[in-house]
């Protein structure tokens, strides 16, 4: 299953989660960064 990877090359540690028709990449290292990014 290939999904448009437009959210900056997703790293292997990042997991793509589909929520409310929205692509959310939950990263263990980018977890804090994701919250800061609006």
Curated annotation (Swiss-Prot):
Major subcellular location class: plastid
Looking up InterPro entries in the UniProt record yields: Ribosomal_bL36, Ribosomal_bL36_sp
Q: Name one Pfam family in it.
A: Ribosomal_L36
* Name by which UniProt lists this protein: Large ribosomal subunit protein bL36c
A GO BP entry is: translation
Instruction: Give the protein family.
Output: Belongs to the bacterial ribosomal protein bL36 family.
> What UniProt keywords apply to this chain's record, in alphabetical order?
Apicoplast, Plastid, Ribonucleoprotein, Ribosomal protein
Could you name the Gene Ontology cellular component terms for this entry?
apicoplast; ribonucleoprotein complex; ribosome
- Localization terms from the record: Plastid, Apicoplast
What one GO molecular function would you report for this record? structural constituent of ribosome
